[in-house]
């Protein structure tokens, strides 16, 4: 594998996908970032509950797929000078990172055992502006519970009724609720509960602009897709049509 890409774009992608990496995980491969080089560069971080993917432009001279230690790779790229970075692998399981006169060599793992991150292509979906989603999360996330004895309250409930998105958070003492107008949907009573951790990471990436975020939900997962990012999280409560949430009554 060999590619050349801009340091600032690579650094941003690493910073984003690293948020899903659990450095204390007992499974070594999940401590790393998966790098797929083809027409573009795709980077993925996951701990199975939360997965984050970022795609950036790169000049790919030789395609390939590897796993690199998230912490080490992040530290190296962050310290490199601005400009184009060349990354190349060899047959000794080493990855060569060079920028101007600075060079680093680190080990990499095969990506063969990395879990497949399945995107949600055929679920129920709605669209919302990035700024609106950011504001509604910011206005309600403070009331999410930290008490793991009631895990359902460690997330926010999303409810979609036609052209209204309602987000509710409650920790047993405080309740935060906010409604947001969204483009018309066919749903009347679609609801699901998103973990606070996923919302925290999403909040760090969302921008205060009119970028369209597509939110797709199916069974026990939700996907937020916008720009070059995809965030997939397990739900705390399976999504449902109509009626009240069993746990949020």
Q: Where would I find each of the regions flagged by the language model?
A:
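Structural preference for solvent-exposed beta-strand-turn elements
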Residues: 1-249
């Amino acid at each position: 594998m060999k590619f050349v890409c801009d340091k600032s774009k690579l650094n941003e992608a690493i910073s984003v996908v690293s948020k899903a990496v659990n450095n204390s995980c007992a499974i070594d491969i999940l401590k790393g970032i998966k790098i797929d080089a083809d027409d573009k560069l795709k980077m993925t971080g996951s701990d199975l509950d939360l997965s984050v993917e970022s795609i950036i432009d790169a000049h790919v001279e030789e395609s390939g797929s590897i796993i690199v230690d998230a912490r080490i790779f992040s530290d190296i790229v962050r310290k490199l000078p601005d400009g184009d970075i060349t990354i190349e692998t060899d047959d000794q399981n080493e990855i060569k990172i060079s920028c101007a006169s600075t060079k680093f060599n680190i080990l990499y793992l095969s990506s063969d055992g990395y879990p497949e991150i399945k995107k949600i292509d055929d679920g129920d979906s709605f669209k919302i502006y990035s700024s609106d989603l950011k504001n509604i999360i910011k206005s309600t996330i403070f009331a999410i519970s930290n008490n793991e004895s009631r895990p359902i309250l460690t997330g926010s409930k999303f409810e979609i009724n036609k052209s209204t998105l309602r987000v509710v958070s409650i920790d047993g003492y405080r309740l935060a609720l906010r409604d947001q107008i969204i483009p018309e949907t066919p749903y009347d009573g679609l609801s699901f509960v998103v973990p606070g951790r996923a919302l925290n990471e999403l909040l760090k990436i969302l921008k205060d602009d009119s970028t369209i975020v597509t939110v797709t939900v199916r069974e026990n997962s939700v996907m937020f897709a916008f720009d070059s990012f995809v965030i997939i999280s397990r739900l705390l409560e399976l999504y449902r049509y109509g009626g009240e949430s069993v746990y949020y009554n």
